[in-house]
């Protein structure tokens, strides 16, 4: 048994991170609830743009139907942009845009489609301050509140948290696990997006699902970056770098988690290398933002490893600390577990799950069950991303924007 010396401060510093993150999440959420500025009278039209390769016709059609069912009060249009060779008979879409196969520009794949639609809006005179654009992927559904706040937000660029609550944790053990491995996404939004986007206006993370900007913002930043992935992070950090006004609001952009472990790895592989390419290329992503993202990766790796090591030493009695530090450790441990339970509690709720479980006892029982499951799985959901990142890094850079299957027999769509 060793009595802790000065070196234990390194372990204790790692234990303090969950306390700091809890403070950030509470502060950011309260700030968004009280300080998010709205001015709907400044805007005349909302364009909700759904980007898809074209394989998820049924899922996209469902999203269109849901949005129309909201009976939104603002003037809006739904644009669907897709690749050639797929169905184009979307009902309720105001614009169906097929990107020509021979269209060329600096970015490729999804960012190429964004580039093409941007040029169309410029030609039509829609690159204006009074036009709002909301980017939606083929697996995502903005809640009614999300659309209303995104449209009304008096910002050049804004968004709310991503919540994987569409068919959350159903359809077999793989999707149950993949859903909970998406809990850190919502956790990062609630903790870091709420503060870096909402309070500081200097984003550390940016997600393309639900990103809401003005037509003027799109034309100011543009989609001419030489990128394959991480188009959202590149766009958002460049907007902040050029002094555009960032905002964050409390409403859910609802998405579907990967259905299998294989699809999960494909998705993370694309994300990791998109970030690496952006961080390395200072002509694409501002150097200081790239450095911040890199440091966050390193801190996450080191702190998680040291924390697991420290927990083992403390619980096994190899090292002994004072009762005060012991209490600090248990407080931090409790907050760490709660920080994964809260996203699961949110993801297990919402309108998508109310539709699946109309009886109150099923709805609330599911929320409680998933929150408890997330608490028990905290070591897995915290540690697994480290292993996934290592695997994806050594797998090498993907040459294309890898798309995963979003629909499944369990959706009933």
Feature annotation, model-predicted:
Residues 62-76:
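Short, acidic, metal-binding catalytic loop of nucleotide-sugar glycosyltransferases
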Residues 237-254:
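Catalytic donor-sugar/metal-binding loop of nucleotide-sugar-dependent glycosyltransferases
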């Amino acid at each position: 048994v060793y009595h802790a010396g000065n070196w234990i401060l390194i372990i204790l510093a790692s234990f303090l991170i969950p306390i700091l993150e809890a403070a950030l999440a509470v502060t950011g959420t309260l700030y968004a609830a009280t300080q998010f500025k709205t001015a709907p009278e400044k805007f005349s039209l909302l364009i909700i743009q759904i980007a898809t390769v074209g394989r998820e016709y049924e899922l996209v059609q469902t999203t269109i139907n849901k949005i129309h069912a909201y009976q939104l009060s603002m003037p809006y249009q739904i644009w669907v942009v897709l690749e050639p060779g797929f169905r184009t008979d979307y009902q309720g879409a105001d614009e169906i845009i097929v990107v020509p196969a021979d269209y060329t520009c600096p970015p490729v794949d999804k960012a190429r489609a964004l580039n093409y639609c941007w040029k169309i809006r410029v030609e039509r005179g829609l690159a204006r301050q009074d036009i709002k654009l909301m980017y939606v992927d083929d697996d995502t559904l903005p809640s009614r509140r999300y659309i209303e706040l995104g449209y009304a937000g008096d910002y050049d660029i804004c968004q709310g948290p991503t919540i994987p609550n569409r068919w959350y944790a159903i359809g077999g053990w793989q999707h149950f696990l993949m859903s909970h491995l998406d809990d850190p996404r919502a956790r990062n939004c609630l903790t870091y997006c709420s503060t870096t986007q909402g309070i500081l206006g200097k984003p550390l993370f940016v997600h393309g699902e639900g990103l809401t900007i003005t037509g003027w913002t799109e034309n100011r930043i543009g989609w001419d970056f030489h990128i394959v992935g991480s188009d959202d992070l590149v766009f958002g950090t460049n907007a902040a770098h050029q002094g555009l006004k960032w905002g964050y609001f409390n409403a859910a952009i609802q998405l579907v988690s990967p259905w299998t472990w294989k699809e999960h790895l494909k998705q993370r592989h694309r994300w990791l290398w998109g970030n690496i390419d952006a961080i390395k290329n200072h002509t694409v992503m501002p150097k200081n933002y790239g450095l911040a993202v890199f440091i966050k990766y390193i801190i996450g790796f080191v702190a998680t490893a040291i924390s697991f090591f420290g927990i083992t030493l403390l619980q096994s009695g190899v090292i002994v600390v004072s009762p005060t530090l012991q209490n600090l450790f248990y407080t931090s441990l409790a907050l760490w577990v709660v920080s994964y339970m809260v996203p699961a509690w949110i993801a297990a709720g919402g309108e998508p799950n109310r539709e699946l479980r109309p009886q109150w006892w099923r709805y609330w029982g599911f929320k409680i069950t998933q929150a408890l499951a997330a608490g028990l799985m905290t070591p897995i959901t915290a540690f697994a991303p480290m292993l996934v990142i290592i695997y994806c890094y050594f797998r090498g850079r993907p040459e294309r924007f890898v798309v995963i299957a979003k629909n499944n027999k369990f959706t009933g769509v």
